[in-house]
């Protein structure tokens, strides 16, 4: 039987629900794909592990924009500190990196120089003479008071009449013959009397009362040379001097022969914070590993723990700085067959260094890979002309220029990628 609805005439017909089209209800927004960083073929790019704390490269890339602007809230300077071992002593590598960056972004001068130096005789980027100082370094085998050390791991005590002179030069690298500002840094518990003589002209006297903070005296002008003489400085510790520009790039070389980077954690926090007030770095580059890697070393757990502590210490004292860790470069040894090979311990250390960068949220550049990887140090040694020494460990100035060029190109490419990503995300 057919079912019949006896009340159908009395019912209101059901209204059909129209299917809404895109004009009546909003569609979900189009999801914008994430910007994908690329790396140019043949280039070893920086691996940025920076997070929301911004200790990767972002802060540095943004700081570079300051060199071409005239914002009243900043001085137009971008400051870079390079901490390392004997691989970069005498301004190897950093001299050419400084020149490349200053040519592009402006700036002049060699930057920070310790009061005395064992490499002053063969550092080509500044003429450095001194006398009358008692020098102390964290790597000394004799007693060293860690509480007194400054940013370079040194402190210097003057005798009456002690002097230090810096003279610009033009034999190696450009933009170093003159600077616009020269400074000296010290900590005095008693009054101090200094004399500054610029360009071998008239002497100018300076007197400062005791202070509990890091002090700085500066002279300005077109400065080709500056000589500081200590007339009286009871209870005063000196740390270094500088030749800088007033705008553009400042790059300071803090090399320390025999260092592994672990001694950075022992520099007093108060001292580093006061240096940060005087020289607020936008980028800190760490170059270590020569004094850590062993021929067959596999386990570097203790080193990883120590360097993580050093990096955290730098983060706390330089809260605005980007931090870039460079891997150890290639280091070769002769096998029993007389063949030159990369130390196995080097490759193991590089894996630890990359983990250190990732765990601390900073940036990492694989210098070993950039050099050419396996056996690349031997290739540099045997190049014509040679770019490294026959210890198959240290580069020379030609090798430094080669590696500086590789890092410079990587930094510029990273900056371009960062700018593209920022523009894309603001569309």
Briefly describe each language-model feature range.
Residues 89-191, 196-197, 208-305, 394-395:
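Conserved SGNH/GDSL esterase-like catalytic core that processes O-acyl groups on lipids
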